[in-house]
A protein has these predicted regions:
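Acidic, glycine-rich flexible loop/linker segments
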Residues: 1-89
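Conserved alpha/beta-domain cores
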Residues: 52-193
């Protein structure tokens, strides 16, 4: 729960020794905040901590709607580093395992064995909970140099995800083999982006 801001404009390097407060709600960094602003931010932080404490009291209890329907709450993950939060927060499983992060963490195409181990670790750690794995969604906002994708004016609608998988079949088959092998170690479903 550490707030972070990206693509910040007008960052100055002469902030050494100055207090800075990151406000993730409003995407702001306050340098040398006024006492009133600091007090306001501290108050909001305390309110957040109270809300988290209330949510913690719900852990382990059924997720039931006002009309009596029980629902499962699933988490989204990018890999093994997120599994602890799934377990800690009592998620019913994983609704989206973004496998492109396996690719983003590599400097070359990940091997079948490398992928198998990554998927197996997650599945074993969460078994018997369901894990919905999305095949590689590279392209648009997530790219890797080794794939050598051409620039597109509108990459969100262009050559990405399943389109890449269907034209680079060796790449796709490697991932599918790794997923099929790993499926023996947990409750896995596969979705295609």
């Amino acid at each position: 729960n550490i707030p972070a801001l990206i693509q910040c404009k007008e960052i100055q390097e002469d902030w050494d020794g100055k207090m800075a407060v990151v406000d993730g709600y409003n995407a702001c960094v306050y340098v040398d905040p006024t006492p009133d602003l600091l007090e306001s931010l501290k108050k909001r932080q305390q309110e957040d901590q109270k809300k988290l404490a209330l949510l913690a009291e719900l852990k382990g209890k059924p997720n039931t709607t006002l009309d009596g329907k029980t629902v499962q709450v699933f988490a989204n993950i990018g890999g093994m580093s997120d599994v602890g939060a799934v377990q800690q927060n009592d998620a019913g499983g994983v609704g989206l395992f973004r496998t492109e992060f396996v690719y983003l963490n590599c400097t070359d195409y990940p091997t079948e064995e490398y992928q198998f181990e990554a998927y197996k670790q997650v599945l074993e750690s969460l078994a018997p909970k369901k894990v919905v794995v999305r095949t590689c969604d590279i392209g648009a906002d997530k790219t890797v140099d080794y794939m050598k994708l051409d620039h597109e004016d509108n990459p969100a609608l262009g050559y990405r995800a399943i389109r890449i998988c269907l034209t680079r079949k060796d790449f796709f088959k490697t991932q599918l083999r790794a997923l099929f092998r790993a499926s023996a170690y947990g409750n896995m479903s596969i979705m295609f982006p």
